[in-house]
Amino acid sequence: MRRISAVSAVAAAAVVALAGCGTGSGKSSTDSQKVVPTSATLSGSITFQTWSLKNDKFTPYFTKLVADFQAAHPGTTVNWVDQPGDGYATKVTSQVTSGSLPDVINLPPDIAHAVAKTGDLLDLTKNVPTLATDYVKSGLTAYTYADINGGADSYGFPWYLGTDVSYWNKEMMAKDGLDATKPPKTFDELVAQAKIMHDASGGKDYLMSRSPGLSDIVNSGTKLMTDDGKKFAFNTAGAAAMIDKYTTAFKAGYLPSNVLNDKYEGNTSLFQKGQVAWTTGGGQLIDSTRQSNPTMADKILPSPALDTAPLYVQGLSVSSKSKNAALALAFAQFATNDKNQVAFVSLAKGFLPGSAASANDPQFSKSDGTPQGDASVIAYKDMQAAVNFTPPVWTDAMNTLLNQEVAKAMTGKETAQQALDNTVNQANSLLTQ
């Protein structure tokens, strides 16, 4: 199963180019805004495309899903196809330009945005009256775009979602005078406790172990883009102040010295080795750690993510050019109803359903009293208000640029404001290429 994440630089460039070219017929906008008649008996066939999900683990689930739908609607056929993990955005680009986009298609928000810009995805708000009550709000928001009809449309049913939970090494924290049952809740509290750990250990132990990124900028109270979604605009005083706090902490020795260079192993790796006392990860991190490092797993306690949690989401979209839109819409709703979503994430450990009704399911709302049980419930609660921080037009090249500029600021080569100005200006230039 493919992890929910941004697409590669090449793939991102492909979908941005697709949106920029406005590929599609002259009636694409009208197609996306149409209302699909749903009163007639369903019949005929459609194609349903997933992304890197045809394997021993998930194939039985999808085989049954399709069979159940066809049994409930005699005379219908759902042809399930799956695309490999690599090159998916490029494949979707090819499908749009050739007019062969599947009727129901698995898309993350960034690729969905590019396809929606061409008018090739159906607006679900006009076709599903219960959309806002049937699905998790945070997931729906990820498929609304400010630069398409002012953000009034929605182009994906939230399907399987993820978020981050904070994890703490209680043994390491206790040694340095901190209590993992009273962890930081905000970035400022994190810095304060990082100082305590640093001072108590003589600079040998670390609570913080990563440089700031987009999520930190958003959590500083900064909007990443203009209200119309057409330009980056995160070079604010608030964002600069946040980077300055990281810089001060870095210079004081609260972060590992290699956090800004190629020798940096990553926050999670350092945590698993017992070299830092805090990391973030999905709701199943303790269980996954137990498989590789049982001793470490017993030292971990979870808590909600600092400030606002990030959202990772995959969804199902409906082609506005489908020749059997009624069947496509019905199947997409069936595949993402509460029963089928819960069944799917029971196989996809660490992910959460995008159905609103899952909030009433004890497996997501009640802990069994173990740290892992607590983490699972925390993840589900965090997901409700989580935010997809990454704009759909943000590419790997832009992220590399941000990291380089932040590193310059944290090492005193330029001010935080200069770093943000440079990043915003160059990222906006990349948008027009």
For the regions a protein language model found, what residue spans apply to each?
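Short, low-complexity disordered leader/linker segments with a strong preference
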Residues: 1-47, 71, 428-433
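Extracytoplasmic "Venus flytrap"/periplasmic binding protein-like
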Residues: 68-138, 175-177, 277-278, 353-354
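Extracytoplasmic/periplasmic substrate-binding proteins
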Residues: 51, 243-330
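Short, solvent-exposed loop/beta-turn-alpha elements that line the ligand-binding surface or hinge
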Residues: 125-138, 183-185, 200-201, 222-242, ...
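Short, well-ordered beta-strand elements
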Residues: 41-54, 76-81, 104, 155
